[in-house]
């Protein structure tokens, strides 16, 4: 099955709503509409930027989509500081990240919570980008594939085969995030292939073949082409490079097979 590449820009805790508008405008200007037939492009701003991004995307009829970096497993109630999936859906979000390594590390989120958040996202017709990945000591011990398979199973626990078919998986080796280090294309492919095999055992081969698996970890315009040329890598969860409108647009164009005539 041919899977359309997805380039997702995770802005993390960067850019106020004015800066968000400027960045989306830069991306829109630098990436002509014809590329969107070949690649899906989404930005993942902080919550406080979402309404501004929505207004710009809707008003200018831009073809890029947008989403959020997290959501609550609860729909509403006395959960101070949490953000409901219903709120995100009302703002027109398409995607939501769950289980990013920074959430797992700094907020002690475990696989069970990630699975609950993924289920909540799906309930609100949001596409969860479920993140998994190993720390350096796990890779150096040679246990990275087993670790990622176990984390995947835990993060999908309770989801039906049909629901699994609606998620995106992002493999993000923790040791490569924001460090400038990047897994080699063959190293990334090894884990992404194992992820797809595990998806087949959890759902079906047909569903596994349809799910997009992204690589995240110091993705930039220089390495994205080699990464997505791998059989089981369908795009990138992009961090720092997504804050540079020109580089992000270039990266997306490469993922589309560009430059296009």
Swiss-Prot record:
Q: What's the domain of life for this entry?
A: Bacteria
Q: In which pathway does it act?
A: Carbohydrate biosynthesis; gluconeogenesis; Carbohydrate degradation; glycolysis; D-glyceraldehyde 3-phosphate from glycerone phosphate: step 1/1
What catalytic activity is recorded?
Answer: D-glyceraldehyde 3-phosphate = dihydroxyacetone phosphate
Identify which top EC class this enzyme belongs to.
isomerase
CDD domains, sorted:
TIM
**Pfam families reported for this sequence:** TIM
The compartments listed are: Cytoplasm
- A biological process from GO: gluconeogenesis
Keywords of this entry:
Cytoplasm, Gluconeogenesis, Glycolysis, Isomerase
> Record keywords: Isomerase included?
yes
Q: Which Gene3D superfamilies match?
A: Aldolase class I
The UniProt annotation places substrate binding at 10-12, 178, 218, 239-240
Main localization of the protein?
Answer: cytoplasm
Would you name any one GO CC term? cytosol
Name the job this protein performs.
Involved in the gluconeogenesis. Catalyzes stereospecifically the conversion of dihydroxyacetone phosphate (DHAP) to D-glyceraldehyde-3-phosphate (G3P).
Under the subunit heading, UniProt states: Homodimer.
According to UniProt, the name of this protein is Triosephosphate isomerase
- Organism taxonomic ancestry: Bacteria, Bacillati, Actinomycetota, Actinomycetes, Mycobacteriales
């Amino acid at each position: 099955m041919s899977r359309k590449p997805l380039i997702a820009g995770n802005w993390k805790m960067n850019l106020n709503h004015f800066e968000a508008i400027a960045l989306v405008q830069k991306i829109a200007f630098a990436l002509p509409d014809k590329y969107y037939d070949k690649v899906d492009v989404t930005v993942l701003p902080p919550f406080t930027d979402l309404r501004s991004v929505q207004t710009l995307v809707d008003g200018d009829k831009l073809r890029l989509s947008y989403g959020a970096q997290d959501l609550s497993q609860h729909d509403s109630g006395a959960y101070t500081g949490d953000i409901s999936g219903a709120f995100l859906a009302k703002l027109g979000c398409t995607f939501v990240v769950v289980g990013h390594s920074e959430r797992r590390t700094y907020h002690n989120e475990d696989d069970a919570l990630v699975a609950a958040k993924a289920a909540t996202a799906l309930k609100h017709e949001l596409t969860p980008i479920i993140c998994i990945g190993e720390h350096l000591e796990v890779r150096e011990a040679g246990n990275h594939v087993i670790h990622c398979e176990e984390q995947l199973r835990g993060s999908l626990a309770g989801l039906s085969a049909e629901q699994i078919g609606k998620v995106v998986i992002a493999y993000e080796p923790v040791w490569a995030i924001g460090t400038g280090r990047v897994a080699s294309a063959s190293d990334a492919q090894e884990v992404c292939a194992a992820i797809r095999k595990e998806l087949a055992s959890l759902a079906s081969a047909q569903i596994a073949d349809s799910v997009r698996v992204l690589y995240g970890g110091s993705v930039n315009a220089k390495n994205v082409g080699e990464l997505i040329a791998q059989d089981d890598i369908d795009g990138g969860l992009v961090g720092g490079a997504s804050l540079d409108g020109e580089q992000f647009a270039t990266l997306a164009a490469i993922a589309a097979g560009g430059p296009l005539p």
